[in-house]
Design a protein with these regions (language model features):
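Cell-envelope and extracellular/periplasmic
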Residues: 1-262
């Protein structure tokens, strides 16, 4: 029987973890950290994502970087969990469980995130599953990275604050009013090319973290994209590279510490 400290990780592709390339220090998995995954298929049909969750049980597996086509892909929740454990916050007899609910390319504007929408409903289902596992389980943090999809849709930013605020208010009403919520800026390599529309959504998120209480915002302007880290042959400018994801997780943890130490 495990007693889990549960970390929610939700949003789109930078929360899913799409960064690759060289790193200063290789990530070493902890025997105390696990993922909660859902099996799904994601297809693009007429320019829109079609997400289908398999009717199979959720899976708990060791938390580690994914290998795709012989390349390691980072995930900022891993270094967040690493720092959480190093700081002595994981008490004896407890484990970390990361609820992996992010899917690339998703947004509020296309009715995937938000109260009653498919991804948020699946997130709630996964959260309930995690909390109801045998043992003493508790949610310790909600890590969010999203907004790129809503930045590129004309006028979508006008509803972004209300939809994100309502979603997080609903989550806290269900599971705890003081659950720390942490979000972050986009990859600057991509954001700088579409600055006006991106900054509107980023500033909304930044402001919301100041208003909602027990929340933090992580700045990322110095973090490299896959394109910047891996050379001109790589054109992926929207995703944090693997090294940046390692750093990002530590910054999320610093924001978390600032919240819990107030």
């Amino acid at each position: 029987m495990a007693n889990y400290d549960i970390i929610i990780q939700a949003g789109q592709s930078n929360a899913e973890g799409c960064g690759y390339g060289p790193v200063t220090k290789e990530f070493v998995p902890s025997p105390n950290a696990f993922y909660l995954n859902s099996e799904k298929t994601v297809d693009v049909i007429e320019g829109l994502l079609k997400i289908e969750y398999a009717d199979v049980p959720f899976e708990i597996v060791p938390a580690e970087e994914r290998t795709i086509n012989d390349m390691l892909y980072g995930d900022f929740s891993l270094t967040f969990a690493e720092e959480y454990e190093k700081a002595g916050l994981l008490k004896e007899g407890r484990k970390i469980l990361m609820v992996r609910a992010a899917i690339g390319g998703t947004g509020f504007c296309v009715k995937q995130w938000g109260i009653g929408m498919q991804l948020y409903e699946k997130l709630l289902e996964m959260t309930e599953y995690a909390l109801n596992l045998d043992g003493d389980n508790r949610i310790v943090a909600f890590l969010w990275h999203q907004g790129e999809r809503d930045s590129v849709e004309e006028e979508a930013y006008k509803n972004y604050k209300a939809l994100l605020s309502e979603q997080m208010s609903d989550f806290r009403a269900r599971y705890g009013a003081e659950i720390p919520f942490i979000a972050a800026d986009f990859v600057n390599d991509w954001k700088s090319k579409y600055f006006e529309q991106c900054e509107r959504v980023v500033q909304i998120t930044r402001d919301l973290t100041k208003e909602m209480g027990n929340a933090g915002f992580v700045e990322t302007s110095d973090l490299k994209s896959n394109h910047q880290q891996n050379g001109e042959e790589c054109t992926d400018d929207i995703h944090f590279c693997r090294e940046s994801l390692h750093i990002l997780g530590r910054r999320y943890f610093k924001a978390f510490q600032d919240i819990i130490n107030k």
